[in-house]
Structure formats: structure tokens, C-alpha cells
Amino acid sequence: PKVPLTPTQENELLDFMQNDPVYAKYYDEVVILLETGLRISELCGLTPADLNFEKRFVNVDHQLLRSTEDGYYIEAPKTESGFRQVPMSAAAYEAFERVLKKRRDGRCIEVDGYKDFLFLNRDGLPKTAVNYDAMFKCLAKKYNKCHKEPLPDVMTPHTMRHTFCTRMANAGMNPKALQYLSLIHISEP
């Protein structure tokens, strides 16, 4: 079952990550996921060209995927509405600034015309969903050992997206606006 983080869990998770010697390096990525509602493949595909700091939005028009047969490849959003501009909250803006400041040069890899990916693994190659799935699983295990309120049983990058959508809906965001931002499916009553 898809269970979002509670506001308390969200805050405690970020505090934990910020102060943990292993997971501090993932802090900005998790902040960005929680603040934008991006799919993990959309996050993985981001390059500096996708960030508009002046107007404070993230341009989403592609996603980075990887298969064992084909290696890395870029895919456009599945539908026309998948192309969107996602606002940067103050927290997301600051996280992106830190990411760019700390960014190291990776291998000169170009995938279907895209290069300079923001999030690289230790080998200097672009991260993909599988990197984050493993990280979230280990993060939840370590977090749950020292917190009374455990994280959901299934903890994945999609949990961050679900948390974003739930937080926005609870804050009273117009369902159509939320649908645009994160491309969630809203069932009519």
C-alpha cells in the first residue's frame, strides 16, 4: 500500500538525514523530491538547463531510464500533460543551489542529446531509480532502528511523491492544479 509520510515523519526523516554520516549526502535529493513531487526518473534526468532560478521552476520534459539491455536512455513524458513546469519552493530552490555548488564533474556521458546530469553515482555516472530504491530501503531500516514512529513498510522514492501530493491536497490545493503539478489521477466523486 502507498502510505505517505506524516508531517512528523517527514521532519524527523530530514533531521535524521541531515545529521547522519551516511545519508547526509542524499539530503538535498530527498528535499527536492518532497518539495516538487517529481517522479524519480524525472529527477534523475535533470540537468542545469532544466532549472530556472530566476522564475523559480523546474522544467519537466524528459526522464532518464536505464535497462540492462539498452543501458541509459531518455524518454519523453507519456502524455502531453507530462510536459510541465513545477514551481520551486524556497526549500527546493536552496537544495538545487547546494546540489549545483557541490556538484563534481562526472564522466562525459551524453544520453540521447542530454548531458551534465545533476545526480551522479560514485562512478560519476547518472543515478537511476534502482540507485534510489536501494538507498531508501537502507535509509528506512537505519531510521527505524532509532525512532519510535517507524517509516512506512514500503519506503521508495514514490513515497516522497505521494507525501508531496498528500501535503498539497491537505493544504487545500485545487485538485486540478495538483493534477497538473504531479500528474496524479484524481477520481471524480
Residues covered by each model-derived region:
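Generic alpha-helical secondary structure signal
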Residues: L5-E12, N59, N131-C138
